[in-house]
Structure formats: C-alpha cells, structure tokens
Design a protein with these regions (language model features):
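Histidine-acidic metal/acid-base catalytic patches
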Residues: 2-8, 17, 43-53, 59-65, ...
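Metal-cofactor-binding active-site regions of metalloenzymes
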Residues: 8-13, 42-43, 67, 73-80
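Aromatic-lined carbohydrate-binding surfaces of glycoside hydrolases
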Residues: 11-23
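Flexible glycine-/small-residue-enriched beta->alpha junction loops
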Residues: 21-51
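Generic preference for hydrophobic/aromatic residues in regular secondary structure cores
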Residues: 35-38, 82, 245
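Residues that cap or delimit alpha-helices
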Residues: 60, 71-79, 83, 200
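Helix-loop segments that flank and shape redox-cofactor active sites
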Residues: 145
Length: 303
C-alpha cells in the first residue's frame, strides 16, 4: 500500500460480523429508506435462527417474552428477510454467507474471549505499527458497529476506554483511529466530542453520519444533520483539531466521507447496483450538507 502512495489505512477488528443491521430497507416518513438495528429482531435471530447455545442467558425474562412474541408474529418471508439482512453484513463479499457456514464460524469465534481478543489486537499493533511508522503510513482502526456485543461476539473497539487501550498498547503517530460518528453514536454512553478532544491527534480518517436512537435500544441511520449525534458539535471539534494541527505546523488534512446514505429518488430503482448503505444520491446529499456545515463553522471560528 505504501508503495502505491496509500498513506491512510482504515481497518477493523470485528470478528465474523462487520456492521450489523436487522432491516436494510427501513421506510422513513419522507419516502426514503435507511438501515436499522432492532435488538428485538437481533435477539430473535440469535435464539431462533442462529440457535446459539445458552443465548437465552444473555437476556432477561421480560425481554425473552417480547422476543418470543415478536418471532411468532413473523411470516416465513419476514424470517427470511431478517436472516438475509443480518448475513448481508459479512465482510469481503456482496454475497450472502450460508447460514450453516456462519454457524460454524460463529462457534469458532465464541471460543475467543474479550480479553484474549484485546491481547490479539495489542499483539497485532506491536507487530504492524513500527513498520507502518517507517513507511509513513497511518493505521486507522474503525469502531465496532454497533458498539456492543452481538450474538455473544465480543466487541473491543466500542467506547472511550477501549479506544484508549488500543492507543496505549502501542503509542505511535501511526497508531490511530477512524472516527465514525455513526458507529460510536449508536451508544448514548459515548461522548463523541470528548473522544475527539482527547484523541484528536490520533484521528486519521473521519466517517460522518447520524443515527436516531430509540428508548427500546433500537436505532436507525438518520439524516446526516438530524438525529441523536450532535453533528454541529462534532464538526466544530474536528475543525478545532485541524486548527490545533495547523498551529503546530502539522498536516491538517484528514480524509473524510459522508459514510452511509439514505436510498432516495432514482437510487430506489437500482438498489442491486450498490452495497447497502452506499447509495449515490443519499451520500452525495450527506456530503453537501456536511461540507456546508464545515464551511459555516470554519468561517465562524476563523473570522
């Protein structure tokens, strides 16, 4: 990668499952569709489709009753849609992974504890980062999405403490973060502005999108400027980080993308042409909104 002048490498340490959603076509009031995660649907998959051993022990009795009622209400087609929605989040392919293959790999992954996985990440960083530093490459780990355990699989890049752990495991300018406001923002416990302020010099890549969190633990991917993520405060903190870098004579450019977007207008007619979440029109709209927000904040801070 370095030989081809790729200086920022985004990667993740999510086992088996990449980003996980239970509905890839959640209808919004404006007619667009978005990605949604519902813990009720996820638990139904976990217990009744994946049939993870002792899965019920991870949920309380009241919630288990709700899951049972929910699953019984699903038609055969709806069960199939739920399964496909979850298995679509497998890394490295646009094809659905076979459920039996998923079950086999899932059992292997469950044998790795959270502590062991963190040890593995620290080992990886200590082996990779010194070489990356020599080559001038910035490694930018992406947060877990969603930022909590799913189907019993541990998550280790999901909150402030875990980000601090991996940065402290191998202190280096090349050991850094992809700041994803959507992934981290799915948890109300994550203070996104504090993460930027405290780890700003280690942010090498930025993914900006919003999520709307609901009281039942579900969330959907909202419009970029509307939702539970205070995007104006996040953008202000990012611009302030760039100003700090400029004052120190450091590189201030941070690659940014609008991340996922809604399915809008003509994109509704060609959903087979793009990966879920990566619509052209929805992401272009998000980029325009974020660029305008950045411009306004930058002008107000520098004027």
């Amino acid at each position: 990668l370095a030989k081809n002048d790729i200086k920022v490498v985004c990667y993740n340490f999510m086992q088996l499952i990449d980003w996980t959603r239970t509905n890839l076509d959640y209808k919004l009031p404006n007619g667009a569709s978005a990605l949604k995660y519902d813990p009720l649907a996820a638990a139904a998959f976990d217990i009744y489709i994946l049939k993870r051993e002792n899965a019920e022990k991870d949920y309380n009795d009241e919630f288990l009753q709700e899951v049972s009622t929910f699953f019984k209400s699903l038609s055969t087609a709806e069960v199939s849609k739920l399964e496909k929605s979850i298995l679509a989040g497998m890394p490295g392919s646009r094809k659905l992974i076979d459920l039996e293959e998923f079950k086999k790999n899932h059992k292997t992954v469950l044998a790795i504890s959270k502590n062991k996985l963190q040890d593995n990440l620290a080992y990886f960083l200590k082996a990779i980062i010194p070489e990356a530093e020599k080559l001038g490459v910035k490694m930018a780990i992406h947060p877990d999405d969603p930022p909590f355990s799913v189907f019993g699989v541990p998550r280790i890049v999901s909150n402030y403490e875990e980000l601090k752990f991996l940065l402290d495991a191998c202190p280096s300018p090349s050991n850094g973060l992809t700041f994803c406001s959507g992934s981290l923002g799915a948890s109300s416990e994550n203070d996104l502005v504090k993460i930027i302020n405290d780890f700003g010099d280690k942010i090498h890549f930025i993914h900006l999108r919003n999520v709307q969190r609901n009281e039942n633990g579900s969330f959907y991917e909202a419009e970029h400027l509307k939702g539970s993520v205070p995007m104006e405060k996040v953008m202000k903190a990012i611009v302030e980080e760039q100003i700090k870098r400029n004052q120190k004579g450091e590189i201030v450019n941070i690659p940014m993308r609008p991340d996922h977007g809604h399915v809008l207008l003509d994109d509704m007619n060609r959903q087979d042409d793009f990966y879920s979440g990566y619509s052209l029109i929805g992401r272009a709209l998000g980029l325009a909104q974020l660029s305008g927000l950045e411009m306004g904040i930058r002008e107000s801070l520098l004027s």
